[in-house]
């Protein structure tokens, strides 16, 4: 950069040149926004410009060694313009127009994760834009909007800016190549390439990629055909449409999902956008109620009846968004956190042995019960998999209530086992069958399999972060289960009701425990990631008198001192290494394996597992007691960690016992409740306590 050393009256010429690196010049109240062209015409003469206050320039411009190569520069001074040989046109700064003025109420959503980002009112205002400026810059030199669909977040912990842009879409060049390939392979003429562009835009407007969710291939193609019909477009065939989708959403996979005899091909990793108008169609609401099955197939259970025609539904869809539509969109977003690919296992056959059936009940009726109960359980899985919990009550009422099945007429079986829809079982036969002990035991075993599958669908990983809205919905669902089933089976014998409610109580209690465990995991994750808290915890733990703890606990637990010392050292070492929550979970799993290894394959394995839980809880309570007496600064953190580790130990042990006994965890937790769920069998229990609330304590107390 060159300056004139003359006085204020002498003219001077100044030229700006890009160089290596330097911070940008702070903008003054008077600025000129300059856009540089790629190159200057040959022979162009640079005109000198007089500067009225040239003696002040060295102090302002001397530190600058670089002008950012983004071809946008800020110049200081009054009416002066610093010219550059590479700059063709200068534009004056206009303070009137405003670009994207942020406010405290503005919110943006990132499509893949759904995290909400609120732009604070204290964010720096955006630089007004000019219609001929290629890219708008803020004071720091970063682009405010660099591409369609990207948002800039001002400010943060590290004063950095993050661009929220969906990265899984194909680039324009890739889309052009995809169109060319389709034209060559499918023989599509060039005049139809414009139609392909409109199809691509429709896909980008209505669908997005997301992990852990799926969409039936046929449903997506039906949406496409409806779009072409509404806009009078010529659709491509299904194979070409599949190639088109894979060219837009890179890495898309295909899976065959569903129960046996009713599985469908799904695109795995794609979903409808929550704000897509396709969500508002009544047909799509019914798709989600039936795992988003295609229109041409008859669903096993259709919870919502169609009230309006397709034309009426589509014509009014853009006017109002009903609560049902909002809930459907939210459920579809939550589906990425559950296991929608879970395959429902087979049921065992009832073992009748030499038991004589009651009068009027035949093996023909038993076969019909197997078919209708399997169909009923599959419908339950479909509804839960789509998070439509309120339909469970209607399902149970339709199966058990007297209004749903007539006592008149004979039992009928379908023409083939692949089509269980034709099976019919009158209500009086259903009651008679449930009063048969082998049938009741078989139904309880089926319920254990069903509810364990539902737990694995709703909570596939107890430590994985999930939205609080989904957790609360699951807890509300668990709270209603016992009342729904009792009401639906009001006409059945008390023994049948107690058996059924005993299993569903264990299911509800499992959902409550797992959601509580998940909540503790998210709270503890923040503690384990805080270095200062970890250091304080380690300092407080080193002050605990573990020798005194061992002396007091040895009389009760009778544990080997070497085992206790090894656990103490491993715990301190893991804490000192600032391990993550997943690493702590692996350590706890290894502790359970080491302690129960000597009891593997032994009939005493369940008792040894329960004893280990009691001893673990007693030792941890003694350590917390010592920390409390010493007024440890990290007592709150230790209390949270202790709650999490106790719950996770319970989770690990119940799964080890289930594996050792060949049962499901639901069956292990509900073994006492399955015998009887009445309060008469629970002396000392508080009035009004549900069987599910007694499940955990009863299982631990069973030491024989």
UniProtKB/Swiss-Prot annotation:
Family statement drawn from the similarity comment of this UniProt entry: Belongs to the RFX family.
Record's keyword terms, sorted: Cilium biogenesis/degradation, Cytoplasm, Differentiation, DNA-binding, Nucleus, Phosphoprotein, Spermatogenesis, Transcription, Transcription regulation
Biased composition (Low complexity): 10-20, 307-334
Coiled-coil intervals: none
One BP term from GO: spermatid development
GO terms for cellular component: cytoplasm; nucleus
Subunit structure: Homodimer; probably only forms homodimers in testis. Heterodimer; heterodimerizes with RFX1 and RFX3.
Predominant localisation class: nucleus
Name the record gives this protein: DNA-binding protein RFX2
Cited Gene3D superfamilies: Winged helix-like DNA-binding domain superfamily/Winged helix DNA-binding domain
Function recorded in the entry: Transcription factor that acts as a key regulator of spermatogenesis. Acts by regulating expression of genes required for the haploid phase during spermiogenesis, such as genes required for cilium assembly and function. Recognizes and binds the X-box, a regulatory motif with DNA sequence 5'-GTNRCC(0-3N)RGYAAC-3' present on promoters. Probably activates transcription of the testis-specific histone gene H1-6.
Positions of modified residues (Phosphoserine): 28, 416
Region described as Disordered: 1-39, 292-334
Signal peptide positions (record): none
Cystines in this chain: none
GO molecular function: DNA-binding transcription factor activity; DNA-binding transcription factor activity, RNA polymerase II-specific; RNA polymerase II cis-regulatory region sequence-specific DNA binding
DNA-binding region: 199-274
